[in-house]
Amino acid sequence: MANKRKIYNLADPSLDNYNLLLNEVIFHNANGYIGIRYDFEEGYPEGYEINRSQYINGFYDYTEIKHAERLYGVPDRKQTMLDVADTQEIKLFIDGEEFSMFSGKLLEFDIYLDMDRGVTVREVKWRSPLGKEIALKITRMASLHQLPLFLIEYEIDPLEFRGEIIIESAHDGNVCNFADPDDPRTADRCDQYIIPVSCEIKDGASYITSETSKSGLEVCSCVKNVLSQKNQTEFLLNNNKTTCIMRTKASSERKIKLVKYAVLCDSIRYPDCSLTAREEMNKALSVSVSELHRKHEGCLRTYWKNCYVDIDGDDELAQAVIFNMYQLNQSASKDIYGNIAPKGLSGDGYEGQYFWDSEMFIQPFFTITNPAISKTLIESRHLQLDHARENAKIMGHKCGALYPWRTITGEECSGYYPAGSAQYHINGDIAYSIIAYYLATKDIGFIAKKGAEIIFETARLWMDTGNFYR
């Protein structure tokens, strides 16, 4: 059954742009706090359309909603989940030749997702234009045990090759959100909402701290590169981007391994996100890489123990169900400051906002298999209850609470009334999820403390909205 928890490369071996975009989603790494789309570390040729992005659940800025005419009760701003600093980039040079999937000759190539280990792996055997051969194994993990941590293990096997190896590992604070004016699920403008305010090297690690332009939030990313053998290292700092350049010698008798540690911390959860980033990096470096994987895999074993199902006679369907359960775990916030967006942490779709999908399509799964996550999702709605009360007043109600149709912070983000603010059934969805949680857990203490307050306030809204005849 374990082989059903491994999904191999679904892309055309010709490296078709469309399939590469699909792979960005299928093989993304996430843990409910951070999400990293799957892109080749070395990049792509000119002209390729990609969406190379990293996210933090619930980390947002305010953006304008444009209206032909202003109307009362229709919001004029929304919250948008932001791209944060890019920590993926790794360029490799062998005797001056730059490795690229699009030059030389690919002798072997595969990408797979291992849902037992919680990693994505790319394996490549490559011959350079001048005939040098190397094998690469690149493993990526977003830790379920240490949520701010993203890890890349970049293993180089020189095949019948001796010479100089140069690795350039970058950390880039210059990012902007993906936009498509023709897709209503995404932003219509590619704006830079997050502004780097500091970029520095401390104790061999790079730190980039950025601030949002309007919401007053801050995020710090920290990157540390550790190479398995002696090397000459230098750092370049240029325009809020750091590059760690490592030079070493390669021979066919020994593999070379780079471990790239990256941590992302935001000021919503951590008041001093720069200090926390440093502490999280030190925590990751204090144990072996194998120990980081062991703890991460332990979280997954517990998850699968509670929810694993198999379907006899249809392996493809069984794997599809398993993949969906894996993605639910990657998408669900593990704290009260996030929730679950329709695209999870795999992309910018719907700008990272939360809808009724959370309560009606996703939360029932966690209520049965992992009620602690379901409880956290309810707590996130309780945290926004005052916003819901205010929203009810804006919509003309004397009492009760009206939850927004789409939101990150609790404020309505939909500028289209019929498919936004008018969707009052979001109240019923949230109340339903709380009742379902109680029926499954009998957690009357939590209901008395938080759940009942939401149910009562949404019920008051129904009484104020409806016309009742006795």
Annotate the PLM regions:
Residues E155, I322-N329, D348-G352, W356-T367, ...:
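Contiguous, well-ordered alpha-helical segments that form the cores/surfaces of helical PPI scaffolds
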Residues M1-Y350:
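Acidic/polar, glycine-enriched structural segments that form the non-catalytic walls/loops
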Residues V175-D182, G347-G352, L383-N391, E457-L461:
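Short, mixed-charge aromatic SLiMs
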Residues A332-S346, A372-Y432, Y438, G445-K449, ...:
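Helix-terminus loop motifs that line ligand-binding clefts
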Residues E89, E98-G104, D314-I322, E359-P404:
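Carboxylate/His-rich catalytic cores and anion/metal-binding grooves
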Residues L258-K260, H296, A320, L377, ...:
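Alpha-helical packing segments of well-folded alpha/beta enzyme cores
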Residues D83, L147, L317, Y354-S358, ...:
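Active-site-proximal structural scaffolding
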Residues F161, I165, I268-L275, C307-I311, ...:
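Inter-helical turn/loop segments and adjacent helix faces that build the functional surface
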